[in-house]
């Protein structure tokens, strides 16, 4: 697929894709994923062509931007590493997120509270989100999916080839997709300027690491408060000593 020069993959984005290990695919390859294989490493891992990945990101973004109401796009991730990315994507683009377990019947059973009638569905993993893809096929909803080389592609209309098992890879794909959608909608008109949002915001964070970081910040803050208290005490002590010396000198003069 040839893209206009405006949509060319920049060196910065290529470095991001490689740093996030988006190019590391599975050892097994589905027949529909063979065009996305760049080469096979000696250890058996297949390398994904990141140029193809970028082309599919642009294609998916153009499809998403063509939908007038952003809420008609549903972003789904039952995989833990993709839930934070889905929520951030929805917050930035206005899509409807489903992070966690997908309730069966959400697209087919209008009696359920979670019933939705989206115009487009985006999933993180065709295997873990198989129920959402199956229901989308029943009601003719197009599906965009982040697919690894061994992922099933039945009922997937647009497959974005990537490493959909790594937390950095998943977060970066959702980040680039959100940025491209905002650019096509005109929210980010200047393509030469970087987006103010960093990719790290889309990465999965372990709750234990967050608690540890919070505890360290509190410890540092308490340490600073202790140092300030010590400094204040020393200043008060020095002031008291000066006052005593001055009083003693006055008594000697008298």
Curated annotation (Swiss-Prot):
Residues annotated as region Disordered?
212-254
Which GO BP terms sit in this record? ribosomal small subunit assembly; translation
List, in alphabetical order, the Gene Ontology terms for molecular function in this entry. Answer: structural constituent of ribosome
Describe its function.
Required for the assembly and/or stability of the 40S ribosomal subunit. Required for the processing of the 20S rRNA-precursor to mature 18S rRNA in a late step of the maturation of 40S ribosomal subunits.
Question: What PANTHER family does this protein map onto?
Answer: 40S RIBOSOMAL PROTEIN SA (PTHR11489)
Q: How does it assemble?
A: Component of the small ribosomal subunit. Mature ribosomes consist of a small (40S) and a large (60S) subunit. The 40S subunit contains about 33 different proteins and 1 molecule of RNA (18S). The 60S subunit contains about 49 different proteins and 3 molecules of RNA (25S, 5.8S and 5S). Interacts with RPS21.
Spell out the protein name for this chain.
Answer: Small ribosomal subunit protein uS2
Q: Which organism is it from?
A: Kluyveromyces lactis (strain ATCC 8585 / CBS 2359 / DSM 70799 / NBRC 1267 / NRRL Y-1140 / WM37)
Name of the encoding gene:
RPS0
């Amino acid at each position: 697929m040839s893209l206009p020069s405006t949509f060319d993959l920049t060196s910065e984005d290529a470095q991001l894709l490689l740093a996030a290990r988006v190019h590391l695919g599975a050892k097994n390859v589905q027949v529909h994923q063979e065009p996305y294989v760049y080469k096979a490493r000696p250890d058996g891992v297949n390398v994904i062509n990141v140029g193809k990945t970028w082309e599919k990101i642009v294609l998916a973004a153009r499809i998403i931007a063509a939908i007038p109401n952003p809420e008609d796009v549903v972003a789904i991730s039952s995989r833990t590493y993709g839930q934070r990315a889905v929520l951030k994507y929805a917050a930035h683009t206005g899509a409807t997120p489903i992070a966690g377990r997908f309730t069966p019947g959400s697209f087919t059973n209008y009696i359920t509270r979670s019933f939705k009638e989206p115009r487009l569905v985006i999933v993180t993993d065709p295997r873990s989100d198989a129920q959402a893809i199956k229901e989308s096929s029943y009601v003719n909803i197009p599906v965009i999916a982040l697919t690894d080389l061994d992922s099933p592609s039945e009922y997937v209309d647009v497959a974005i080839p990537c490493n959909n098992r790594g937390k950095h890879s998943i977060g970066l794909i959702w980040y680039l997709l959100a940025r491209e959608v905002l650019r096509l909608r005109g929210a980010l008109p200047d393509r030469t300027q970087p987006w103010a949002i960093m990719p790290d915001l889309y990465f999965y964070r372990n709750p234990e690491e967050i608690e540890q970081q919070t505890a360290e910040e509190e410890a540092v803050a308490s340490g600073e408060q202790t140092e300030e208290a010590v400094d204040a005490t020393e200043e008060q002590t020095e002031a008291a000593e000066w006052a005593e010396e001055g009083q003693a000198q006055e008594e000697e003069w008298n």
